[in-house]
Design a protein with these regions (language model features):
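Leucine-centric amphipathic alpha-helical interface motifs
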Residues: 18, 24, 30, 98-113, ...
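Pro/Thr/Ser/Gly-rich low-complexity, intrinsically disordered linker/stalk tracts
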Residues: 133-185, 191, 254-282
């Protein structure tokens, strides 16, 4: 069983067949996934899971992951998170994972940035092909994804990836990535510098405990930025450091922004902040 791929732009009146594709294996996450660089989880509701091989990629919502281990007896998966041009984010139980590697249907048409393409998949079985009018429409806005710089990797706050809490001055660090060089294998978040792609800089934003933007660093070319406790106190407007912060980090190449950005939230400890939770240290 496979499908015929039909598509058209929003402005077009008729769908045209573009090619064929194979349905990919899929499953549902039985547990939540935290924002982390590696995850081990269990799954249920699987379909064709025996076709999944290690070393292949899959999608969970908008995040691309690398399958590094799979056990169909225990229904467990180990995943390297946030590969290609994506970053790790949290996922709820019941999120679907699509093991798409090798099962793509390809539309060879060229579309302009900003166009919206509508696609319909017509299931093909031994009994016939689904009618075009009966197929569900999926829409995708063209956003020049292939041309966007990769977001930085290995993001850490005081040398910790995705901390729950941080104390004192903040050293936010990361590693370069290069979409033009990363063409052989899927690179984990934890890898060291690759590149960077020529012309890429980084933008770092700091948000305070109420969610308001407090400071922006632009045009960064290195792999770290310090945000001192004095900076935090001055920016907060509270006469003290923020009790919680969120940082955003993205890549920028002459106004072309990475598809995704890192967004990391954490509490602050010390100086009377969350004393009941972190008394004795963190």
């Amino acid at each position: 069983m496979n499908y015929d791929l039909y598509s058209k732009t929003n402005s077009a009146t008729t769908y045209n067949q573009r090619g064929q594709g194979e349905f990919c294996p899929t499953a549902v996450l039985a547990t939540s996934l935290a924002q982390e660089v590696t995850s081990t989880t269990t799954y249920s509701g699987e379909l064709d899971i025996d076709l999944v091989a290690t070393g292949t990629y899959a999608y969970i919502n908008d995040e691309v992951v690398l399958v590094t281990a799979i056990n169909t007896t225990t229904q467990s998966l180990t995943l390297t998170r946030g590969v290609m041009d994506t970053v790790p984010v949290s996922h709820a139980p019941g999120s679907r994972i699509w093991f798409a590697d090798g099962a793509q249907g390809i539309d060879p048409s060229e579309y302009a940035a900003g166009e919206t393409v509508n696609a319909r998949l017509l299931t093909v079985t031994g009994k016939g092909t689904l009618a075009l009018a009966s197929a569900t429409t999926d829409s995708l806005a063209m956003n020049r994804r292939q041309n966007r710089p990769y977001p930085p990797g290995n993001v850490r706050v005081n040398n910790v990836a995705y901390p729950a809490v941080a104390k004192g001055d903040l050293v936010i660090s990361w590693a370069h990535r290069d979409r033009l060089s990363q063409t052989v294998s899927l690179v984990p978040q934890t890898n060291a510098n690759i590149g960077p792609e020529a012309g890429v800089t980084y933008t770092l934003r700091i948000y305070g405990e109420a969610g308001s933007l407090r400071r922006t660093y632009t045009g960064l070319t290195g792999t770290s930025q310090t945000y001192t406790l004095a900076d935090d106190t001055a920016d907060s407007g509270l006469g003290r450091p923020n009790a919680a912060l969120r940082i955003e980090l993205e890549s920028n190449r002459s106004g072309v922004i990475s598809l995704q950005k890192h967004s990391i939230a954490f509490e602050r400890a010390g100086y009377g902040l969350h004393y009941d939770k972190y008394y004795g240290g963190i």
